[in-house]
Amino acid sequence: MSTDFDRIYYNQSKLGGRFRLAEGGLGWKASATGGSASTQNNEPLLLAADEVSSVQWSRGCRGYELKISTKNKGLIQMDGFQQEDFNLLKNDFQRRFNMQLEHREHSLRGWNWGKLDLARNEMVFSLNGKPTFEIPYTHINNTNLTAKNEIALEFDTQNEAYNPAGDELVEMRLYVPGTVEENEDQDQIMVKDEAEAEDGVKSEVKTEEGSEEPDVQEEKTLAEYFYEELRSKADIGEISGDAIISFQDLFFTTPRGRYDIDIYKNSIRLRGKTYEYKLQHRQINRIFSLPKADDIHYLMVLSIDPPIRQGQTSYPFLVLQFQKDEETEVQLNVEDDEFEKLYKDKLKKQYDAKTHIVLSHVLKGLTGRRVIVPGEYKSKYDQCAVSCSYKVNEGHLYPLDNAFLFLTKPTLYIPFQDIAAVNISRAGQTSTSARTFDLEVVMRANRGTTTFANISKEEQQLLETFLRSKNLRVKNEDKEAEQRLQTAFGSDSDDDDVDINMGSAGEDEESVDEDFHASDEDDDVAEEFDSEASASDSEGETSKSERPSKKAKLE
């Protein structure tokens, strides 16, 4: 007869389920909640009795937790038990599996240093014999030596079998001081956490007994030793011989450097001199293959989500640069039977072509993403991009069939479906700005604007025509200003009907001010102070009489 427990959470899942202990093993199944899609994603767990290695009981997030260490399937966590369930579980494991249920208490002192035990399925950080926290190896996605004595651990946030509720940790750094001499006893190593570096208090790292130690040929830092040991335990660094295909010394503009690329069945690893990155195929959303405007290089852009990280910097785009005529000859590292079964319709057995074409074809086959290439747009100089600047960065804007792509730093991708309008304007009236214009992209849902400046005026008509062909709303501020000016001056009417208000300069006939009456006193004053006043008046009358009369205005 089996023993059941309800409202138990498997590996910190969002949904509870039923946990069952039986003679042949144990299992878990998510509770049905109206047939929701989230329930369907939680596959039932079945574990044979001979697969269980050890079991532990401790406090958890939702009560008490049962931690099951397996021989080949990593670590299993069952959370949500009540305190009174301990005796029942202890008796069941003893009776059914002949196994002791170990009760472990966590250290709650809050110290950031202690002993680090690289156990079979998890990394345990403990203080005074009590664990402070545990990290299963399956949750560690990558590790890097960020400094001489510093190691960064990056956690896997894309594991489909791990669905935590709420926020989760994405990175942790450890400070590991000291060095290792040749033939030095490696059983206990001093290490401390990054945040404790100022305290000067050291802790220890302890490796599992019987683990194979690497041959030390020269002095190395404890950080290097710990880094290699962790990679071995967590299987972070796949064996290069298992890679389906590899490319050597490829140049990346983002993140900048040269990296070797090893492509595996479900993941890709970038190996540089200082940093290594690992990304799953499912992280790649888009693949772009574009010629650079210098006609010498070719660019390949990978849009990835979630982005890879380097400290506080995240990289949502990976940008590779190739020589345009660079060629590669490579063969897939798979057996013929495996190729016929898995890759025949996706890849070629052997490649001999330009490097960017080979890499794009391989990525397309393994990820299932299509390769986006330049569309129908051509600039005045028959290129697929226009030179411009974004803020203080100069680059090139690629008008693709369905989006804008700005390269290279920062890389910006703006789908046309997210654009509300495009404004074309000049930044000023100087001689320099008269030869260029700005392209302002207004996003939908009040998500702000993005401005690409200093685009050559020669490209305006071609770019405007292209955008209108994509059913985008284009607003030319210069043309609208000119139309408003013409409307203000009535330029749309015939010349004969134009009657522009020009003030007194436009009067055709003289008008008499009826309110003004000249007096004799004015004449007397003129004669008194100007002896030629009368002569001037008479001359004025003479000249006035000699002036030709104006022609009558034709109606």
From Swiss-Prot:
One GO CC term on file: FACT complex
GO biological process, one term: DNA replication
UniProt-listed Pfam families: PH1_SSRP1-like, POB3_N, Rttp106-like_middle, SSrecog
Family to which the UniProt record says this protein belongs: Belongs to the SSRP1 family.
UniProt subunit comment: Forms a stable heterodimer with SPT16. The SPT16-POB3 dimer weakly associates with multiple molecules of NHP6 to form the FACT complex.
Protein name from the UniProt record: FACT complex subunit POB3
Organism: Kluyveromyces lactis (strain ATCC 8585 / CBS 2359 / DSM 70799 / NBRC 1267 / NRRL Y-1140 / WM37) (Yeast)
Region of interest (Disordered), ranges: 194-217, 476-555
GO molecular function: DNA binding; histone binding; nucleosome binding
Gene name per UniProt: POB3
